[in-house]
Design a protein with these regions (language model features):
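Outer-membrane beta-barrel pore domains
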Residues: 49-200
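Aromatic- and glycine-enriched pocket-lining scaffold segments that form the walls
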Residues: 1-50, 54
Length: 200
């Protein structure tokens, strides 16, 4: 990892990360001997504005599940992931973020994993408060009848008591795809989150 092209204004125009890791993803152990390759580039044209792209290639091991077999077949199932996003975060004002990610595994000419996710977020720093509104979606193109296929509208607010302690309240309204509606028996759901976050 590193930074290049110093702006002379307290930040660099380009940050990069390159990693070779064990596991089916960089943060998860795997029993095979394949390595994951991870590459990430962040372009920072202005102090509060970042554009980032990430690519991950690896091979995961099928997991034996209770009552059935694992996803894929064998110890070396290919998996590709990429994420692109941009964000503008002024600690005294506007916070805008958007991100899209795709994950795919194809074994014996069949999609075993094919998933898409995205979100758009807008917020505004008001002293110790950060109110936000967010839209996000997730699409599982293989398991279309699960609750993983949704669009969500979220309204939330974070209150920073001090640097290492925050309280957060979120309300989310989920809307499900047609196949998920049929399988679940309902077309929407609600979620309320109340969280306390500490750093030591």
């Amino acid at each position: 990892m590193g930074d290049v092209f110093d702006s002379g204004k307290g930040f660099s125009y380009l940050h990069y990360d390159v990693a070779v890791t064990n596991g089916s993803i960089p943060c998860k152990d795997d029993s095979n001997k394949s390595k994951d390759i991870y590459v990430s580039l962040t372009v920072r044209p202005a102090k509060h504005f970042n554009i980032k792209g990430t690519f991950n290639w690896g091979e995961y091991t099928s997991k034996q599940l209770e009552g059935g077999t694992g996803v894929g077949s064998g110890d070396y199932n290919p998996m590709n992931r990429y994420v692109v996003g941009a964000w503008y975060d002024n600690p005294r004002g506007l916070n805008l973020r958007a991100e899209y990610g795709h994950m795919k595994s194809r074994v014996n000419k069949a999609d075993i994993v094919k998933e898409n996710g995205a979100y758009v977020l807008a917020g505004w720093h008001l002293g110790k408060f950060l109110p936000i509104v967010r839209w996000d979606m997730y699409e599982d193109c293989v398991n279309t009848g699960t609750a993983n296929n949704y669009n969500r509208i979220l309204i939330g607010c974070t209150y920073s008591v001090f640097k290492n302690m925050k309280f957060q309240v979120n309300y989310g309204h989920f809307m499900y795809g047609d196949d998920a509606k049929k399988a679940l028996g309902y077309d929407s759901s609600e979620q309320l989150q109340i969280m306390a976050m500490f750093k030591f």
